[in-house]
Amino acid sequence: MLGRSANKSLWIAFILLAFTGCNRSQPKPEDTPTAMVQSVIPPEQHVVQKTFSVQKYQTFELTIPEHCLHPRLHGDFKTFHYGEQGNRANDDAANVDLLLLDEQQFNDFIHGPGEETTRSAQNTHDQVIDWALPATFGNPRKFFLVFNNATGKPKIKIIDANLTLSFD
């Protein structure tokens, strides 16, 4: 009878140990952080804020930082030429083309008559610009803003431009 009692006690001890072992709290698995891209909106960039002259074309480089979903180029420009009496005239003779070109388009433009543009305002002397630009994801993108005196007449044109790149 003693053998049965000892055997029973062993079984009870075994069951109690197993039961308490199952109820022991498990260590929490460590949370692995999910890779997230922090979206920080860069400050506005003044692409051009000045008055300058153009014979053939004048270029301004701009770079859209990576991870910008809604870049925008906005502002205005006016063009002038000097008339026969030396007076400043703002008329159709002062017209220029404003082109926004990516790197490949700009390369085509300077090495021949490039036809493709990202954005353009053509044959104008007084223009308000509000262009949505392509989003950037993992890499920044470079663009070229080109004021083009396509007709070449008059030979020199004066441009007063105020254009800003923002990242709403």
PLM feature segments, named:
Residues 11-17:
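Sec-dependent N-terminal signal peptides
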Residues 19-21:
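C-terminal motif of bacterial Sec signal peptides marking the signal peptidase cleavage site
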Residues 24-168:
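Acidic, Ser/Thr/Pro
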Residues 2-11:
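Bacterial N-terminal signal peptides that target proteins for export
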